[in-house]
């Protein structure tokens, strides 16, 4: 193939540079390697290492390469580019996309479905006329995948990793040998074999692993090997696994685009850490410090909320409804925080009914309702402005309106920073606007402030900005007040936002809200 072939796909899908670079690497790998079923993996590894020495080992029974891209850069779009490229230039028709959990599984299913907001193949002409057949963990037993092959269609299988390992033998007799066999490996009469074996027999099966760090040490690892794909493509923002308390990096990373690069290149929000001027955390008890951090988080939130409203009004774009993420220690702590922030003691009780608690203590209808509120937190009609969670937010929760994070869990500064900010880095308008209030994610961490600032001096740090409450942000909440212009009202019954300014121009008024009494 040629660079023109890569550019054809990249341009049609409007790929960002990191995505385009990844596609170029795949193009080169396929150019120098003979990737066929049953090929000598050791020989292929040596060939790839000759140009990409970072690949030390495939770590699987088949050639598998990891593309590490920071959160928010666009891993799902890159999956679409890989599939479009492999089909157009190499005739590949069988793909198996693996998700680590139900949330990502549902998201992938939606994004690979035509006429959806984030459809991954927008601009690919052949898929517009003849879209791929989407086979999922919910419909594979219908024989849809085999039918797609019969009509020479591209077949994209999307499975939650649990689906290829789950036995689900509840409906079988206790003495039925099939009870010990994963359901996907059981005979389907319409195709004459199990769907798993059907896939494993394909000469061109390519496996794409989303968030691949999540199933490197499970039964799913062996199951993927048993599929015997011709190629594995792994995507993750964290190319390492935790073993015995230590971080073990992947050995098959062929491309690494870390978060620091994404921040530098403007693909995500810029993180900032907040504190108060001349603040000494040692003067306060743990409870007092916690309340100060929550108070200041709301001050930042309300300032940000006003700024986002002003930006939307001035630019004629959608209004973004920001929210705060509070990371609690445990379920008891979470409940205490919610009770305090809904009480009259906290900003006169105006956040009552606007706080969502996400933890393992909820179940049934309440859990379903909370999950729905969490997944729709970007909706302007969703009242939630504060989310409290206890280690329950996993990959797949892709939101763009998180602007303030309050980490209350004990953590060292580096871990605190990197684990927290990943949740809120996606940009609401798809790119930076040039307005700091719109483009910045703020972490409220008075007690860890100096540690994080010291970390920020590291050239590889993710953080370069600081916010001082009482200086950069008012110590009381703010809101946008729309004042009717009487002249406009008389002439055309319109309203506009005005406020006196030193230059004589009119702009929105930002008014103070009484500060919480300590």
For every predicted segment, state its role.
Residues 2-68:
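Conserved pre-motif I regulatory segment
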Residues 68-73, 80-106:
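Conserved SF1/SF2 helicase motif Ia
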Residues 81-84, 88, 102, 109-110, ...:
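Signature of the SF2 helicase/ATPase Hel1-core->accessory helical subdomain module
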Residues 91-125, 160-163, 329-332:
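Conserved Walker A/P-loop ATP-binding site and its immediately adjacent core
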Residues 119-188:
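Inter-Walker segment of RecA-like/P-loop motor cores
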Residues 251-361:
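Conserved interdomain linker/interface between the two RecA-like ATPase lobes of SF2 helicase motors
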Residues 361-460, 464:
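Conserved RecA-like P-loop NTPase helicase motor core
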Residues 426-518:
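Long, hydrophobic alpha-helical segments
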